[in-house]
Amino acid sequence: MTKLLHHNEKTSLNGGREPLFSQKELLVLAVPLLVEQLLEVTVGMADTMMVSRCGEAAISGVSLVDMINNLIIVLFAALATGGAVVVSQYLGAKDRQDADKSAGQLLLLSGLSGMVIGAVCFVLARPMIRLFYGSIESDVLDAGVKYLQIIALSYPFLALYNGGAALFRSIGNSKISMQISFLMNIINIVGNAVCIFGFKMGVDGVAWPSVVSRVVAAALILRKCYREDAVLTVPKTLRLDGGMAKRILGIGIPSAFENSLFEAGRILVVSMISTFGTVQIAANAVANNLDGMGVIPGKAISLAMITVVGRCIGAGDHEQTVYYTRKLLLWAYITMGLSNGAILLFLRQLVGIYALSGETMELAITLVTIHAGCAIIFWPLSFVLPNALRAANDVKFTMVVSILSMACWRLGFSYLLCVRMGWGAVGVWVAMVIDWTCRVTCFVLRFRSGAWKTKYQA
């Protein structure tokens, strides 16, 4: 599939220039990100498995809120992406002073956004859930409101952690965020087990350990950022710098708008599924968990893509940009083929881990089969390649494509197949594949055109 990107570009580096990244440096960057993504998805699966013991109303309530939670997380991730791109570009241009300044601005913006969003979600938890999902069963609604209000308390700390982790990725040191993520997830899993099985806390038992783990993670990442021997020197006194903040937000806001509308679209299609009852909601939740495993390598490599391409763009080297983009895409195809192949091979056993009824289990198997089979072909070019464009400041194009593809293809076909034709969750997942096809076409053509080369200005 990476041959699609080949258009008047050579696949190796010429001219005697020294490569910006060695094979070892790419692995040192990508492998910890892979482990971190694996930990994140594993904890999500553990949360779902544990709360499933509290009944299908509880798992449905938590899964519905997790869609809102994902919407919030992508806002923080988009801001972190903006900061990581800017820092990487300054490092590529060997401008250490502005790299330090942009690092401080990222942490400041992350903390402020986390506090505002956390307060809004805590106060408006019930109206938000009603707005997104309409008429859902009362016990599912109550479980969702309780979960959202507790988890909202962690948003400021999650935003700070994401910002700090992005800084370490931008300097090629993803090992730090991996280590902290490991500790955060251990706290989460142990806390869940104690609270759910020991204290019988139900939904509360899933939420509170997440809050504690994120507080600890934020404290540790900030401590690392302010160490005297750190590669980046983050200013100890942070004041808003309009010019630098604008540069970060110039990438972060389009990415946030794009990703938040994408997640909002996912929430809308889940609201369509929710009209078919608890069986469909629960099957969709479990399928999302398992499919998260399949895209772990792709997500890790997409994060690495930001650092690598950002550094190449900052150095003004378009040849190396193309070279490393194709190289990382090849890695994504190989690793996602292995991960999704394994899921398909052991699918029934994996779904059997969850406490599901027979009907729910069979539906979950069908949904995972659709996702895993198609992700091997479409996912890398749909979601890894656009990060190369973002790192080159071509954020408006990726935003427009993502929004239009979501609105026209995923939402449009979800309504047609899920609601009008009565396919339920299966219709939504088929519409997802149609959406991916559109993204692949647009992003490949954009990269081949070379239009992204004109977007970055030092």
Where does each model-flagged region fall?
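Short alpha-helical transmembrane segments in multi-pass integral membrane proteins
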Residues: 1-30, 87-154, 196-253, 309-375, ...
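N-terminal transmembrane alpha-helices
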Residues: 17-49, 53-54, 70-82, 86, ...
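Transmembrane helical elements of multi-pass membrane transporters/channels
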Residues: 28-47, 150, 184, 213-217, ...
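Residue-level hotspots within the lipid-embedded alpha helices of multi-pass solute transporters
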Residues: 37-38, 74, 114, 118, ...
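Helix-terminus/linker motif at the lipid-water interface of multi-pass membrane proteins
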Residues: 38-60, 129-138, 194-201, 260-293, ...
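Small-residue hotspots at the loop-to-helix junctions and early N-terminal turns
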Residues: 56-67, 144, 148, 207, ...
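Small-residue-rich hydrophobic transmembrane alpha-helices
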Residues: 59-119, 158-177, 270, 281-347, ...
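Short runs within selected transmembrane alpha-helices of multi-pass transporters and secretion channels
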Residues: 80, 150-169, 177-188, 206-221, ...
